[in-house]
Each structure stands twice: as structure tokens, then as C-alpha cells.
């Protein structure tokens, strides 16, 4: 039986009319004068390839999802009218100085007969704010209400409503905006708690009245680098907060909801944040010259930069690059080389990042060692971390991986910090890359999570590929079978979220890799982790 066939015999059973007929509703928008009125004042008009005019192609970021988690009145997708609404026109717009004309939009929903819900598409006039609009208010604009069971594409005209003859490509003119809002909630006739999603794709083509104006001289071509992520399995990468390899992926309700690490922070377009630096071996390292504290085994180190140049406390960073970003006691090796004769020495040393003497922003930290006379003043000295230790009767009470040290001491304030991150969409949680730090004494909490592997930080910095949206959709692939295990969002500010709301933690094996799929908007609803339900996608 063909559900949506136009010539199918009507059914008198209970399953009749499960799928709606073709949507013949027309958006209440009259055609307006396009580029034809601009030609007399512009002096020239330019021809667009007929193939571009005749074929619908997916708009950049033109895919969104609807799930039961979305509430009526939530804007699922929005885009202003302009060349960026079509990838071909976006490419051509670099050759011209202006444009005029509208678009034709085709909406394809992954319809099926077992879900219910409606999405309203509306054309919002230029310079009209879309924040805070309710579904009832949106019906006052030219609109079309589409059932999620709709199988046939829905056509929407987008005329170029403007108060001038044409738009400059370099100007930020306000234009007609197409928005998609949830009109009635998505629901299914099953009794389970499984979360399902319906995908929608938005395709566009220029209307017959669209044309570019004013051909501009060519300049030196600059290629836009495509965005990628390293094709490395999790176990092949290293932690960006301590020089150790990664062991697993971790998420769950027992993990922190809001975190603010300072190492391993990098935006997707390659901007380093906090105390992040590029060399994995320099994480949690200190270098400088030491001074002995009389009557003790303690030494104070006057810090230097990673290249042994003088450290400037006024630099706009929270602390010297690579400084530990958690409170705890780090044990390692303090090594020194004498410049005059090249002699070397090394001793076990411990630095407490929660101590009142831990003031890296001011240029000094204090170490406890096993010697009181072997280190010389004024010589190049370096601290290399080995692991963490714990003191006291309360097991695993330190290190506290999400507590920031006081970089300026207990009397100062931390400045120039990388911002805190947290999930921004209902039903999502942070995904962490987890390692186990070596324990050197006591019963320390050896789990250490980072937001990005160090190899990703280096890759993003090196490529500096521009972000086309606030969110990149990634999929985690099993390299042995090629099967996609789950999907996740990589946010532009440099952290990953997944859809997981269960009362249990998820620990994922490290033998998979991430693959970049596409740029999506922040309202994209991820398929849930930890169950066998997949996403029904529009073809």
C-alpha cells in the first residue's frame, strides 16, 4: 500500500488519513519588483547560470530537528533573505557589489504516519524583532503551517521586501527573515520514554527576479579552509590539562554541569584561551630560577616564560601558559643545569596549587623538595610533573579538578580567565575526555577530564578554519565496523555536548574517532545516546 498516493482508494478503517494530503496552502505574500527596477539606476545587470535558477539546493545550516523536548513557540531555525541563503549565490556574491530579488524556498520534512505535531513557517518583515514571539503572534505574519507527517515538499516564496532599489553585499541591511517555529508539540502514539526526532531540510533557489549588480574587480583569491577534526582515535590522543594519554570518553549526571578549565581551551577557529599553549610536554611545567627558604626544604621559583625569557605579570593571561588549572598537590622532578660547567642535578619536588604561596600570575611558586642545599640560585631550573598526591584521612578529596587555583594568591582575583562552559540546550550534557593521573602518594582522585584533546587544540590553531555556524555536528565512528555510535555538538567556543538524560553515567571506549558531518544551528536536536533509536532523516 502506498500511504500518500493520490489515486489510492479511500479507506474506511481506523487508519484512514494517517498522512495528510499535499499541502496546497499558499503563503500570503504577493510578488514584488525585483532586480528589474534596480537595473535603470544601477547601470548594469548580471546573468546567473540557469542551472542555479532551476534547482533547489540545501541552504547552509539548512537542517534542523524537532523532538518532544522542543516547546511550542521555540524558534527551530531562522535565516534572513540574502545571497548566503544559497551556497551558489553566496559564492557568486564575492564577485558583485549588490543584489536585488527574492528566493523560493522548499521545505522537506521526514514525515511518517506515527508522529503528530505542526511547524509554522513565517516571513517576518525587515527590522522586526523575532525574540519573544508566541505561536499566536507568528500567525499574524504571512505564514504556512506544516504537519510533520507531510511527505511532499512545501514551497514558500520569499520576496525581497526593501525600501531601496538594491542591497549592497557589504552592507548589513535588514531583510525579510524566514523563521520556523514549533506550533504544536511533537508526540507519538507509543507509551515508551524513548526520545525521537524528526529532521527537516530547507532548500533554496533564486526567484526569476533575482540578479546581481555591479561586477567588482577581482582580487587575490583567498581560499576558505574547510573545517576538519583530526582523524585520531581517542586512545591515540593526549590530555590537554596534564601530560598523560586519554583513556575514555565520559558523560553523565555525576559529572560537573558548569566547568571552567584554563588549559585545553581553544575555539574551533583557532583562538587559544586561558593558559592554553600548543606543546603537550609543557603542560603543568614551571621554569625559572630558585631561591632557598632558610631552615626548610622549600624553594621559591621566580618564573620565566617557556622560552626562558622574562615573564611579564601584566600580560593579559590568567597565569604563565601551561600553569595547572586545578587545586591539588602535584609531585614531580625539579631539575637544574649549571651554566658555567654544565653540571646537572634533580630532586623530587611537590607544588601545592591551593597554597597561599602559589602565585604564578605574580611570577612565583613554592616547591617542597627533599634537599636543602643542592640547588643553586640564579640557574635554569625546571619542574616536570609526574603525578598527584593526597594527604589526610578523607580519601580522594584531592585533587579537585574543577576548582580553579588562586593564580594571584588568596588576596588577589583571577583575571583574563577563559569563560565557563555549560550545555545550552535541554537534554544535553558535556562530553569529557578522561585520563587517569599517576598517583604518587595517599589516595588521590586520579580522574582528570578535559574539554578538548591537546591534538585538537593544535589542529584548530594550525588550520584556523572559519566557523560557518555556532555548532559543528560530529559523529563518533567505530573504525573497525564503520558504524556511527553517537552524534554530538562541537560548540564554537570549544566544548562538546551529547544528548543524555539518563540517571546513569556513560563511559565510552577509546577506540573510535570523531568525524565532522556538517554545520548546524544551536537548536539542532541530537539523537539520544545509550539507546537503539535512530533518527528519521529527510532524504
Curated annotation (Swiss-Prot):
Keywords: Capsid protein, Host cytoplasm, T=3 icosahedral capsid protein, Virion. The keyword rRNA-binding does not apply. Signal peptide: none annotated. It holds the Pfam family Calici_coat. Residues 222-539 are annotated as: Protruding domain. The record marks 223-224 as: Cleavage. Residues 222-274 are annotated as: P1 sub-domain 1. Residues 275-417 are annotated as: P2 sub-domain. GO terms for cellular component: host cell cytoplasm; T=3 icosahedral viral capsid. Residues 418-539 are annotated as: P1 sub-domain 2. CDD domains: rhv_like (cd00205). Residues 1-221 are annotated as: Shell domain. InterPro entries: Calicivirus_coat (IPR004005), Calicivirus_coat_C (IPR013643), Rhv-like (IPR033703), Viral_coat (IPR029053). Gene3D superfamilies: 2.60.120.20, Positive stranded ssRNA viruses (2.40.510.10). Belongs to the caliciviridae capsid protein family. This is Capsid protein VP1. It comes from Lordsdale virus (strain GII/Human/United Kingdom/Lordsdale/1993).
Amino acid at each position: 500500500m502506498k500511504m500518500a498516493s493520490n489515486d489510492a482508494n479511500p479507506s474506511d478503517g481506523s487508519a484512514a488519513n494517517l498522512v495528510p494530503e499535499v499541502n496546497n496552502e499558499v503563503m500570503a505574500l504577493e510578488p514584488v519588483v525585483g532586480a528589474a527596477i534596480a537595473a535603470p539606476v544601477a547601470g548594469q545587470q548580471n546573468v546567473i547560470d540557469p542551472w542555479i535558477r532551476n534547482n533547489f539546493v540545501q541552504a547552509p545550516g539548512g537542517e534542523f530537528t524537532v523532538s518532544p523536548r522542543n516547546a511550542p513557540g521555540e524558534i527551530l531555525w531562522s535565516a534572513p533573505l540574502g545571497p548566503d541563503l544559497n551556497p551558489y549565490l553566496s559564492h557568486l556574491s564575492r564577485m558583485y557589489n549588490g543584489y536585488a530579488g527574492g528566493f523560493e524556498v522548499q521545505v522537506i520534512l521526514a514525515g511518517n504516519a506515527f508522529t503528530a505535531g505542526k511547524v509554522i513557517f513565517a516571513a517576518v518583515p525587515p527590522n522586526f524583532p523575532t525574540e519573544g514571539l508566541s505561536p499566536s503572534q507568528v500567525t499574524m505574519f504571512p505564514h504556512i503551517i506544516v504537519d510533520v507527517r507531510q511527505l511532499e515538499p512545501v514551497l514558500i516564496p520569499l520576496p525581497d521586501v526593501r525600501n531601496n532599489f538594491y542591497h549592497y553585499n557589504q552592507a548589513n541591511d535588514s531583510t525579510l527573515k524566514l523563521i520556523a517555529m514549533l506550533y504544536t508539540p511533537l508526540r507519538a502514539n507509543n507509551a515508551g520514554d524513548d526520545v525521537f526526532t524528526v529532521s527537516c531540510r530547507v532548500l533554496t533557489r533564486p526567484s526569476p527576479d533575482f540578479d546581481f549588480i555591479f561586477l567588482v574587480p577581482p582580487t587575490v583569491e583567498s581560499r576558505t579552509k574547510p573545517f576538519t577534526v583530526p582523524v585520531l582515535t581517542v586512545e591515540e590522543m593526549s590530555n590537554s590539562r596534564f601530560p598523560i594519554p586519554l583513556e575514555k570518553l565520559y558523560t553523565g549526571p555525576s559529572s560537573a554541569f558548569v566547568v571552567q578549565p584554563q588549559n585545553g581551551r581553544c575555539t574551533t577557529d583557532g583562538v587559544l584561551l586561558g593558559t592554553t599553549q600548543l606543546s603537550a610536554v609543557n603542560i603543568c611545567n614551571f621554569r625559572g630560577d630558585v631561591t632557598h627558604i632558610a631552615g626548610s626544604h622549600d624553594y621559591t621559583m621566580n618564573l620565566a616564560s617557556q622560552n626562558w625569557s622574562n615573564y611579564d605579570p601584566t600580560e593579559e593571561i590568567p597565569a604563565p601558559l601551561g600553569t595547572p588549572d586545578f587545586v591539588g598537590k602535584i609531585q614531580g622532578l625539579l631539575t637544574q643545569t649549571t651554566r658555567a660547567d654544565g653540571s646537572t642535578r634533580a630532586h623530587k619536588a611537590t607544588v601545592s596549587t591551593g597554597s597561599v604561596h602559589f602565585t604564578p600570575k605574580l611570577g612565583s611558586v613554592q616547591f617542597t623538595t627533599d634537599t636543602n642545599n643542592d640547588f643553586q640560585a640564579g640557574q635554569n631550573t625546571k619542574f616536570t610533573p609526574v603525578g598527584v598526591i593526597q594527604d589526610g584521612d578523607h580519601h580522594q578529596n584531592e585533587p579537585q579538578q574543577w576548582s580553579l587555583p588562586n593564580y594571584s594568591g588568596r588576596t588577589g582575583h583571577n583575571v583574563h580567565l577563559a569563560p565557563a562552559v555549560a550545555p545550552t540546550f535541554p537534554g544535553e550534557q558535556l562530553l569529557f575526555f578522561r585520563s587517569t593521573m599517576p598517583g604518587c602518594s595517599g589516595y588521590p582522585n586520579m580522574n582528570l577530564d578535559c574539554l578538548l584533546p591537546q591534538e585538537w587544540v593544535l589542529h584548530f590553531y594550525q588550520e584556523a578554519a572559519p566557523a560557518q555556524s555556532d555548532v559543528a555536528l560530529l559523529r563518533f565512528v567505530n573504525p573497525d565496523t564503520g558504524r556511527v555510535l553517537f552524534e554530538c555538538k562541537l560548540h564554537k567556543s570549544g566544548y562538546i555536548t551529547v544528548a543524555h538524560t539518563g540517571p546513569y553515567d556513560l563511559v565510552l571506549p577509546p577506540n573510535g574517532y570523531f568525524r565532522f558531518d556538517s554545520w548546524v544551528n544551536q537548536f539542532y536536536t541530537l539523537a539520544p545516546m545509550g539507546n537503539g533509536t535512530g533518527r528519521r532523516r529527510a532524504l
